């Protein structure tokens, strides 16, 4: 694994906009950055793939343990939703995807930082944009037959939708916030993969989702019942909404399912360590401060907010601001990220269904990744 500095394509903005990637620049700063890329060999990709598959399986086992031992209160979930979440698990409601954030420099085992199991983003750039980047280089002769990419995301998403269609998911609603360009872009892409699988799709802004108490179902902006709904909107936010009580009686089936909120909550890090202590892919995690350098993470913090890195001297080496400062926290052993003269890198390893099938890499000058950290493509040397 190494970071390579190069030159962006002369017309890269037009290239990415042509394929629908409009949010390549955020607040006048580059988000998509092809002035550099990461290079791997196949052995390293196999390490990432195996780690991801093992971690996902352990997370599923951990969720089952939480349900069986009735530990949902550890996750800060209001008690009125506990039985409903258990029902979601027992009904084996399907999951589409998730993204593990891993710390790795190409040596030793990758270490799990967290699992973005509910509302993972950076999907379109991982699936389509970086693949288009690699193909365009190969078409110019710069890398003909020399490089590959860990990326079957597009194909696996279509296959996952085909499976859901076989289970009766003929029409699926998609919801996100119209005011968030990245979320809208990711949902638009997911709609396209569902359409390619033969599913009828309909988009609705999350604020326009209503509830029909007579039919006991959520409804769209045309008052049509929503049987299946993919929402790029966090479960923890939904449980705070005025309509949350209707979740308990609604016939609507959600994607991601309610049980997935257990895996996206950082409490799962401590549960994993309890179940699999000393596992090579895990970092020690606890509900109480631990010895040595550690990272303090609010259990529902998002986009790197309110994260604190604490050294052995118990002084904050780095901390970020945000709205989650008053939440319960998990303490996770600190593990260094890949570092180059350009900054720190986090590997985002994707799961579709229960299979690892792609990767995206975020880079930042700080050791805590946030929502505007740069996305760099990767390639595999054949």
Description of each model-found segment:
Residues 1-382:
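Preference for protein termini
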